[in-house]
């Protein structure tokens, strides 16, 4: 069995990234991830959602990139069943999952900046379908073990995704929240794309609330696309 047998990837992205899949680094990622699936430990998100961010936002549709670090590693209960919070999109959670503190702060700042009503669920799929790539730098995680899949090497792949997108002619709006995400500035060609930075939305970080980050995103989106991005959920 190959990686894409467990984790489907759309034809558009397969064609866009075709040259990556035979490179040694990617074959090593594939090997390590498939080995991790064989161990009797729970891996999030479920393998069918591993590439959900890519599948919801084709390369030709990407207008905004909101980069995350790695998936949520926690669970929630629904009908007495333990389910993963992570769904394959950065900062987003399953429809019926409790909204995590970082996402609550995102919604608070969005409301303060643009008056967008605070939603009752944390599923950001609608943003992805409108052109916001919600990509995590690390695509998988072990249950209750933050950053546990850093060893798999996902960042080499997500960096290639970003660099391929940065080669496009249309200006992209790249939103980097926190110091870890902001390290990716080194990958972005100068004077070609719009970079917007802010502190991480975690309550453990300071400065995100009141940063005006979504005001900046909307201003940039208007400049490039002559209309507002629809942040409603």
Swiss-Prot record:
Entry's Gene Ontology BP terms: base-excision repair, AP site formation via deaminated base removal
Localisation: Cytoplasm
Entries under SUPFAM superfamilies matching the protein: Uracil-DNA glycosylase-like (SSF52141)
Record-level GO cellular component terms: cytoplasm
Domain of life: Bacteria
Swiss-Prot/TrEMBL catalytic activity: Hydrolyzes single-stranded DNA or mismatched double-stranded DNA and polynucleotides, releasing free uracil
InterPro entries in the cross-refs: UDG_fam1, Ura-DNA_Glyclase_AS, Uracil-DNA_glycosylase-like, Uracil-DNA_glycosylase-like_sf
SMART domains for the chain: UDG (SM00986), UreE_C (SM00987)
Cited Gene3D superfamilies: Uracil-DNA glycosylase-like domain
E.C. code: 3.2.2.27
Keywords noted in UniProt: Cytoplasm, DNA damage, DNA repair, Hydrolase
Active-site residues, record numbering mapped to chain: 70
Keyword ATP-binding set for record: no
GO molecular function, one term: uracil DNA N-glycosylase activity
The protein's role, per its UniProt record: Excises uracil residues from the DNA which can arise as a result of misincorporation of dUMP residues by DNA polymerase or due to deamination of cytosine.
Family: Belongs to the uracil-DNA glycosylase (UDG) superfamily. UNG family.
Protein name: Uracil-DNA glycosylase
Organism: Helicobacter pylori (strain ATCC 700392 / 26695) (Campylobacter pylori)
């Amino acid at each position: 069995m190959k990686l894409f047998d467990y984790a489907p990837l759309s034809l558009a992205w397969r064609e866009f990234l075709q040259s990556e899949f035979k490179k040694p680094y990617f074959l090593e990622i594939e090997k390590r991830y498939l080995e991790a699936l064989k161990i009797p430990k729970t891996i999030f998100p479920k393998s069918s959602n591993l590439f959900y961010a890519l599948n919801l936002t084709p390369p030709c549709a990407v207008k905004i990139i909101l980069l995350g670090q790695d998936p949520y590693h926690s669970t929630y209960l629904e009908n007495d069943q333990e389910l993963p919070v992570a769904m394959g999109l950065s900062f987003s959670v399953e429809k019926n999952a409790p909204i995590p503190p970082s996402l609550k702060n995102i919604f608070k700042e969005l409301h303060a900046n643009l008056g967008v009503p605070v939603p009752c669920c944390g599923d950001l799929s609608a943003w992805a379908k409108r052109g916001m790539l919600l990509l995590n730098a690390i695509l998988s995680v072990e249950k209750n073990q933050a950053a546990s899949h850093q060893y798999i090497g996902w960042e080499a792949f997500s960096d290639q995704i970003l660099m391929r997108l940065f080669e496009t002619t249309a200006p992209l709006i790249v939103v980097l929240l926190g110091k870890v995400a902001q390290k990716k500035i080194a990958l972005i060609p100068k004077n070609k794309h719009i970079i917007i930075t802010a502190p991480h939305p975690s309550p453990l970080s300071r400065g995100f609330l009141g940063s005006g980050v979504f005001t900046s995103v909307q201003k940039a989106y208007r400049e490039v696309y002559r209309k507002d991005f629809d942040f409603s959920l």
